[in-house]
Structures are given as structure tokens and as C-alpha cells.
Amino acid sequence: NQQSGXSETKVVVG
């Protein structure tokens, strides 16, 4: 998971 600006973005790479 990447966390930026106090918000969490979940990225799935296939």
C-alpha cells in the first residue's frame, strides 16, 4: 500500500 496526504491508496499490479 502507498500512503500519501493522509489518505491511503491501494494499488494492485498484475
Swiss-Prot record:
The keyword Lipoprotein appears for this protein: no
Keyword Zinc: no
GO MF assignments: carbohydrate binding; IgA binding
Disulfide links within the chain: none
Keywords: IgA-binding protein, Lectin
Quaternary structure and interacting proteins, as annotated: Tetramer of four alpha chains associated with two or four beta chains.
Free-text function comment from the UniProt entry: N-acetyl-galactosamine and D-galactose specific lectin. Binds the Tn-antigen structure GalNAc-alpha-1-O-Ser, the T-antigen structure Gal-beta1-3-GalNAc and IgA.
Family: Belongs to the jacalin lectin family.
Protein name: Agglutinin beta-1 chain isoform 1
Species of provenance: Morus nigra
